[in-house]
Amino acid sequence: MFNRRLTISILVTAILLAMVFSVNANQVPKATWVDEVIIVEEPSVTTAVSRLQAGDLDVYATTSSEPVPFATIRNDPNLDYYQTFGSYSELTFNPVGPEFTDGRLNPFGIRKIREASNMLIDRDYIAQELYGGLALPKYNMLNNAYVDYSRVVETARALEVKYAYNFDAAKDVIHAEMIEAGATLVNGKWHYAGKPIEILILARSEDQRRLVGDYIAEQLDKVGFVTTVDYRSGAEASPIWMMGDPWEGKWHVYTGGWGAGAVYRDQGHIFDQMYTRRTMSQPLWQALEPIPELDEISEKLYYKRFTTMEERKELYSRALELAFEDSPRIYTVDQISYVARRADISVASDLAQGVSSTALWPSTLRRGDEIGGTVKIGSQQVLVEPWNPVGGSNWTFDQLPMRATFDRGFISNPFTGNYLPHRIAKVEVTVKEGLPVAKSPDSDWVTLEFVPEIEVPGDAWLYWDPSLQRFVTVAEKYPEGLKAPRKSVIHYRDDLFDTVTWHDGSPYTVGDMLLPQVLSWDRGFEESPVYDPAEAANLKSAINNARGWKILSLDPFVYEVYSESWYIDAEQNLGDLFAVYYNYGAQPWHTLVLGMLAEMNGELAFTASKANSLDAEWLGYNTGPSLPILDKHLDYAIANNYLPYESFLREFISEEEIASRYANAKAWYQDKGHFWIGNGPMYLEKAYPVERMVHLKRYENYSEPADKWAMFDEPRIAEVELSGPARVNAGTEIKFQIDIAFKGEAYPLEHIQEVKYIVLDANGNVAYSGYGTGVADGYFEIVLTGEETAQLPIGSNTIEAIVLPTLVGGATFDSHTFVTLP
């Protein structure tokens, strides 16, 4: 006989437990849906897809353009993918010279040879054959899916025609320049000082860039060079091309690849980053000698020294022309990439670079409707270079785990690239009348005002003076007064200092905002104990362009910033003292201090270039030989209750906070064995450099719910079809139709920003450009008048439509060919 009472008791208990689990299941956790994430290295996308099929991986975060694995994903119902548009490939040249330090001639130290190399390569061949059709030919640094490309499409297309594949023209230029440089052609091979000139090509071994390395070697061989291809992984190649001294001549060409860190609504920074010394601290960039006019225009675009969109277009167009002439790198393809995942996994994916380029991935990562558990992510590389927020790794592979560990004042919309408030409550933007700044109707957290002029208050802080150990004020530098084209007042949430904590338990304070500000200036001055020559390259420009900032309230924290620079989108006209004022990651003031002490002592350096010059270790807070050195300086800081820039920071950081901070860091290091202390939704449990693995865990004290950004489920990428007559008689009007949809449904007119078109005539020249007219949801028309068709040469023409929706930051293209008849 069974015990009825016991059975009922068990049943009731089971029901109660089920109710508890049901309630818990409906509760939204803080920070993340999952408990932990394991990131492992998997170099091969083919193997990664097999591991996804087997359930050994849940997401493969590295974007790929390989066609065979893509076909596998599309044919497996258990797998799915996200599409991205931000990956692109290039050929990076070693531009120093014309001779290396050992006297060898460097052909790519000759500007005209670099320029001619644009015509030496067939980008269509690379896109179709080497990338299997999952790429588009790329001629300049602008991503053709982003809005800036469409703004200058006429110039861009003309340059694409000028620098299209023309082997004979490239060969003629190279031959003339080599003769001019003193080289001789012996039995079909170039010699210098009696020795053959050998071109050393570093080719990435993990993907199609291996094939690109072989291809460029073949092309260079045809114009008379002996070539050697050295196949290396990214981690193996980086110390040579990026961190090594380019004057040593250990390489000539590198098959580079880049991933846009966001959906760029404004790529005005890109010329400064890729063609000048001002943005990148690595030795290769510090060796650049840009064309002076390009250098000047790059700075103008970076600081927005224009007043109209037409003036901006002229600067952009001229910069594109000069970029081809300078060509320290030439672009090959924009990749049509995918991020593979298991179908039951959901996670925010940025249209630029997928999962790894959005700050939202840790909060949105989830397996079905589950709460908790572990998700395993694969990455082509893991722990490539040291992590530090001043001058550490900028590899996408390192950014993936790093982005999970730090918080921000604003979030970049992964579909449009525009900003959304996170720790910021509101922003008041004031700009000078006439500037082309606009606000999205949905951005109720931003106000926009236009005024005749903006006067900077005399007590605003301008820049740091290391000799005075304080900020120079506007009144001191500009007693006659100072004006700025833009002012922004940033209001942080009232609960900022109550809810945000660092992973070691330290409450977030104003000191975490101020020390990075001081350090960023101080590193540029020779008299500073943390002086870095790479930072000095930008110092003069930074001082001249500084317009000041001022704290209006400490709690709640409110400050105003004046700027020479401004952005077309009102939402992007802000500063964020809370977030990442350095490029890569965030650290609390008390661990930044440890790096400073180690650099002052010559043991570690924040940047690779300074580490090379000091023969010191490149600082890494996450793992490696830096850690015991940092721990040693932590002991010093504890013993002395050390505070840098004491005369300035003492007003904001108390003795009690100093002692508490260092004690927390010590306890953290003793527990975790590293100093990577963030304030984001996940924390670094441990980095395993030998095993190539990173272990992240949910940060229990993170204040924000995991579903805060759940709206970013799927980007509404437009599907475009351009159609029209196949023939037109010159002098006759012709109409073209553009059908725009998403998943078969007509795209609403209110969500289409613009439809632009260009007409390429039979000679490949841009004949006309303009804008289509919206007729109905999902339907636009383009009309070429009889006068316009009369001017087209007889023969085949191509019309291209460029559709820019408002719901995503990427454009969609389609084209149609028609013949002009007499």
Please describe what each predicted stretch is.
Residues R51-Q53, L57-P67, R74-L79, K222-R278, ...:
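Periplasmic binding protein-like
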Residues N26-Q27, V40-E99, D124, E129-L130, ...:
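Extracellular/periplasmic solute-recognition and catalytic clefts
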Residues F21-S44, T72-S87, L185-A193, P362-G368, ...:
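Aromatic-rich, solvent-exposed beta-strand/loop patch
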Residues G109-K222, P290-E293, R318, L365-R367, ...:
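Append "and occasionally in soluble cytosolic enzymes with long acidic Gly/Pro-rich linkers
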